[in-house]
UniProtKB/Swiss-Prot annotation:
Annotated glycan sites: N134, N147
Subcellular location: Cell membrane; Membrane raft
Species of provenance: Danio rerio (Zebrafish)
Domain UPAR/Ly6 per the UniProt entry, residue ranges: 47-141
Protein name as annotated: Ly6/PLAUR domain-containing protein 6
Claim: Amino-acid biosynthesis is one of the keywords in the record: no
Lineage, opening ranks: Eukaryota, Metazoa, Chordata, Craniata, Vertebrata
Keywords assigned: Cell membrane, Disulfide bond, Glycoprotein, GPI-anchor, Lipoprotein, Membrane, Signal
């Protein structure tokens, strides 16, 4: 047999193996996130969250999540994970939310149906990739102080009070 047909077979097999898709994992990776990460936003501080309502599992939620920016009034990504008594996922809900919706994170006890619910919130672009499964995961994680505007408004009265007390003390000493 001449070498050319053998080489042609080798090239053809190489091309065919490139067409065959490998089995893909049912979880998203950080590499997938890089493709979803925006280069521009519709408004300053704009971000995206995975969003779904009562998806059967995390993969289906993340896979079919619409690629939309969160509304301006939202600041966090929320995840609600309902599990059966043995830890299998019953449903997943993810969405963009304001601060008020993130004040009750954590896990509930098993209810009368044998289900447990864990909720988590996070701040950042597409930060709600994983599911909360226990108290360690079901947290509220932020990248900035939650009450930034309230801190500055509380600091001024405290400063004025401190200055007033100090001046009264100094005045009474003299």
């Amino acid at each position: 047999m001449e070498p050319w047909p053998l080489m042609a077979w080798g090239l053809m097999l190489t091309a065919i193996t490139g067409w065959i898709k490998a089995v893909q994992s049912r979880d998203f990776t950080e590499k997938d996130i890089i493709f979803l990460h925006p280069s521009t936003t519709p408004y300053p501080g704009g971000f995206k969250c995975f969003t779904c309502e009562d998806a059967p599992d995390n993969y289906e939620c993340n896979r079919w999540a619409p690629d939309l920016y969160c509304p301006r009034e939202s600041r966090y990504c929320y995840t609600h994970h309902k599990m059966s008594w043995d830890g299998n996922t019953v449903s997943v809900t993810k969405r963009c939310v304001p601060l008020e919706d993130c004040l009750q994170t954590g896990c509930s006890d098993i209810d009368h149906e044998g289900n447990r619910v864990c909720t988590a919130c996070c701040e950042g672009n597409i930060c709600n990739l994983p599911l909360p499964r226990n108290e360690t995961d079901a947290i509220f994680s932020t990248t900035s102080p939650i009450n930034r505007s309230a801190q500055s408004t509380q600091t001024l009265p405290l400063l004025l009070l401190s200055v007033s007390i100090t001046s009264l003390m100094l005045h009474s000493i003299n």
